[in-house]
């Protein structure tokens, strides 16, 4: 399959993260769309065929309608979110290639599906098995999702109903979660546990290309536990304390001794309770921290300490640290992974892109040319777009 499409790789992570607390790549449910007509359209696509209707195979791995419909709805949702309304699927969207919106949709959906299936295929080829730990990972994810989406005492049956508004059912959600586990396991097999086989040179190249940096800080908050601002007098006292901390650290020239002192002062004064989970400091890409903190970090060399930096959170004293492979990367969903593992996942992603390009796609006869206008037509007008035999056959 030698095709490249627009960058709409929603991938398996989106299906899982959108329901387990991740906010950075969340797929909205169709009930969050702007109109009832839009909701009806997505519901129509999901039920256009039986969920277990075979659509195609990818390198021999079968793909069923529930998976195809999920990515179909997710890609459509993203297209519409950026202001494009497709009214004519035969309209050419790329004059240089002559490809239509129907071509765009098919290529985008197939590439996303192929990504998932090739994770499973390549895992098997590399003796990566879905073991008891994988089963537990899936069950833990389901339990957490029930807690988040259904509530205390919720059941898998209730979760299955909720999942319909995210273009999927429980079986598909379990499959995506399994693929997420296999993806991480395959990365560990190819690149070492937590990316241990990734070299320092590869880490530094990745950090520079993607603007990652690492820093420790001591935060003196200018709000109380309820979020209310401190008095001007209390703020002034906090600022003076921050200035004294900065001066004390700057007075130590030896890098190792400076870090040792900074750690001691962190333990004594730091009011950022989350930093304890990052023993080497926060490792983060540009754009993920408040501007004042990030700008101050960029201005520092490794082991250099800032003056007092004020942000909405309070007064910071920042110690820039060298970025290393075992640094824990800040994640929006609270999960942790090393920078080495992040590099390993990127390299696995590059491998998967090549495998997707080379994959053999074999369509079931009915789906060789999908009428997307008919698929997205709500049931009350379904008969106008698909013949009666197709209706009975689904």
Regions found by a protein language model. Name each.
Residues 60-62, 67-69, 132-134, 219-224, ...:
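A mature extracytoplasmic/lumenal domain signature
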Residues 66, 70, 107-112, 116-124, ...:
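Solvent-exposed, polar/charged alpha-helical surfaces in well-ordered, non-transmembrane soluble domains
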Residues 94, 224, 270, 284, ...:
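Acidic surface patches and DE-rich sequence motifs
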Residues 74-105, 124-206, 232-237:
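Charged, solvent-exposed helices and adjacent loops that form client-binding or oligomerization surfaces
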Residues 244-293, 322, 328-330:
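Peptidyl-prolyl cis-trans isomerase
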Residues 5, 132-134, 275, 306:
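A generic structural-conservation signal
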Residues 1-103, 107, 358, 362-394:
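Short, low-structural-confidence N-terminal segments
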Residues 24-50, 158-237, 288-394:
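PPIase-associated folding chaperone regions across multiple families
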């Amino acid at each position: 399959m030698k095709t490249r499409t627009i960058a709409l790789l929603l991938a398996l992570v989106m299906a899982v993260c959108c329901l387990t607390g991740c906010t950075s790549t969340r797929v909205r449910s169709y009930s969050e769309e702007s109109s009832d007509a839009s909701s009806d359209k997505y519901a129509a696509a999901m039920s256009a065929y039986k969920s277990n209707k075979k659509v195609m195979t990818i390198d021999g791995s079968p793909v069923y309608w529930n998976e195809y419909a999920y990515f179909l709805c997710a890609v459509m949702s993203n297209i519409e979110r950026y202001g494009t309304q497709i009214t004519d699927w035969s309209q050419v969207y790329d004059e240089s290639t002559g490809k239509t919106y129907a071509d765009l949709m098919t290529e985008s959906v197939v590439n996303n599906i192929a990504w998932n299936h090739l994770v499973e295929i390549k895992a098997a080829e590399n003796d990566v098995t879905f073991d008891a730990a994988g089963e537990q990972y899936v069950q833990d994810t389901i339990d957490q999702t029930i807690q988040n989406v259904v509530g205390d005492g919720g059941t898998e049956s209730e979760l299955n109903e909720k999942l319909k508004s995210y273009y999927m059912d429980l079986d598909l959600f379990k499959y995506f979660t399994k693929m997420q586990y296999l993806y991480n396991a395959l990365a560990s097999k190819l690149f070492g546990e937590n990316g241990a086989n990734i070299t320092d040179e590869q880490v530094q190249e990745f950090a520079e290309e993607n603007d990652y940096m690492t820093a420790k800080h001591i935060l003196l908050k200018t709000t109380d536990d309820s979020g209310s601002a401190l008095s001007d007098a209390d703020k002034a006292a906090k600022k003076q304390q921050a200035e004294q901390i900065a001066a004390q650290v700057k007075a130590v020239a030896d890098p190792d001794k400076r870090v040792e002192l900074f750690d001691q002062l962190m333990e004594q004064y730091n009011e950022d309770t989350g930093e304890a989970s990052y023993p080497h400091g926060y490792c983060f890409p540009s754009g993920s921290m408040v501007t004042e903190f990030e700008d101050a970090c960029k201005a520092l060399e490794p082991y250099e300490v800032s003056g007092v930096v004020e942000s909405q959170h309070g007064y910071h004293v920042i110690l820039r640290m060298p970025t290393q492979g075992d640094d824990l990367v800040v994640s929006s969903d609270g999960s942790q992974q090393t920078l080495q593992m992040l590099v390993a996942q990127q390299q696995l992603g590059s491998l998967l892109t090549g495998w997707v390009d080379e994959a053999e796609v074999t369509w079931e006869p009915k789906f060789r040319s999908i009428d997307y206008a008919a698929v997205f037509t709500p049931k009350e007008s379904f008969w106008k777009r698909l013949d009666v035999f197709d209706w009975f056959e689904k």
